[in-house]
Amino acid sequence: MVDFPGYSLSGVAASFLFVLLTMKHPDDFRVVGPALPILANVGEDALLTCRLLPKRTTARMEVRWYRSDPDTPVMLYRDGAEVPGLAMEGYRGRVEWMEDSTEEGSVALKIRQVQPGDDGQYWCRIQEGDYWREASVLLQVAALGSSPNIHVEGPGEEGVQLVCTSRGWFPEPEVYWEGIRGEKLMSLSENHVYGEDGLFSVEDTLVVRNDSVETISCFIYNRGLREPQEATIALPEKLQTELASSRVIGPSQAIPVRVGETIELTCQLSPQTDAQSLEVRWLRARYYPVVHVYTNGAHEAGEQMAEYRGRTSLVTDAIHEGKLTLQIHNARTSDEGQYRCLFGKDGVYQEARVDVQVMAVGSTPQITREVLKDGGTQLRCTSDGWFPRPHVQWRDRDGRTLPSFSEAFRQGSQELFQVETLLLVTNGSMVNVTCSISLPLGEEKTARFPLSGW
């Protein structure tokens, strides 16, 4: 190492490096976002801001607002104007550049008609040349749901069920029950459904086994909304209504229906009661959304599940006897399962449950013969269009079961099954075999393949 009087080369290099590291970049600046989250209710406008320090104009800089990917901006502002056509899908037509404070280094993005999907983190990136800095901005979106509704189901064998329902919440809320003295009560079940609009519906069930319980309250709340929504019910009063002593009767057996046919779900009040003034709801697993609603003598379409829109109708010829039939047209495989039929009035409901079994009988099996490389022979049996998953069976001419070499089931876009099964033929003396494909309800299709002369 070469040394100069009073200096060392390593010391000079270290000093030079220190100067480089501490030298102020000609474009040096930083970006600062708000210290606290920005709060906005669904449907309102939100204003996201960030500041350039030290203060200077951003008119000739690039300002990029984005969520997680800088290449997919919410908005891009460059050289004094918005760059069109680059906004993320879902923000197009809803974002606006605010120019009021560009001279002071403050920039703002307005999001109009805030939606639940707007909730979360945003980044504000400011760039000049190749130099950029960014800061994060947190937007917290909230929606206050509808006032809770408590209705009574039963009484049943385990007691009276109280169901607390509400819609239109964001983010996902919490639910709790209290007795008349403020004591917490344990829910039997709690279901939160995320709707097409991005909002949550709540269905919380409480079982009351103590006849002395009089008043019960349901509370629903979420973050950012300090006061919970509340509903209270006086139980003895509800249990004295006429409907509380009635019951709903539905089919005792599952209803079989083929794909494309019409499903008919019939429910009736017992004893017979005129149901014209009642609310009648057909549900799947939860209270919201519904398969079909009849209330105040009319059909309510607003609560209906998307997959049932335009496919349901109601037969009301015997409504004065408390009997109604829901028709679901053009049955699909997704319609299979359990349905709940509820009659209600003044917050008291009685229900029956109905099972639907959807089936589709597939095509006639096709059997083809294939010669293997080792000289052996296999038979391939194929068919499609089955639901639910069918049973496949090979048999010889005497009806004895033959073990298949392999079976494969595939579901297409309509959830119908395609079937393929292979049979290795080891005995050339067999005259013929059959391939049978059947459903649990007894529907069956069979194909026969002759093997004589091999």
Swiss-Prot record:
Q: How does it sit in the membrane?
A: Single-pass type II membrane protein
Superkingdom of this protein's organism: Eukaryota
UniProt keywords, alphabetically: Disulfide bond, Glycoprotein, Immunoglobulin domain, Membrane, Repeat, Signal-anchor, Transmembrane, Transmembrane helix
Localisation per UniProt entry: Membrane
Q: Which residues form the Ig-like V-type domain?
A: 27-140, 148-234, 236-355, 365-452
Q: Which residues lie on this side of the membrane: Cytoplasmic?
A: 1-6
Q: Which GO terms describe its cellular component?
A: external side of plasma membrane
GO BP: negative regulation of T cell receptor signaling pathway; positive regulation of interleukin-2 production; positive regulation of T cell proliferation; regulation of cytokine production; T cell receptor signaling pathway
Specify whether Aminoacyl-tRNA synthetase is a keyword of the entry: no
Residues spanning the membrane: 7-23
Single annotated GO MF: signaling receptor binding
**What range does the record give for the signal peptide?**
none
Q: Which InterPro entries match?
A: BTN3A2-like_Ig-C, Ig-like_dom, Ig-like_dom_sf, Ig-like_fold, Ig_sub, Ig_sub2, Ig_V-set, IgSF_BTN/MOG
Task: Please give the residue ranges for the topological domain Extracellular.
Answer: 24-454
Annotated S-S bridges: C50-C124, C164-C218, C267-C341, C381-C435
Residues bearing attached sugar chains per UniProt: N210, N427, N432
* Physiological role: Negative regulator of T-cell proliferation.
Q: Which family does it belong to?
A: Belongs to the immunoglobulin superfamily. BTN/MOG family.
Q: What is this protein called?
A: Butyrophilin-like protein 2
Species this protein is from: Rattus norvegicus (Rat)
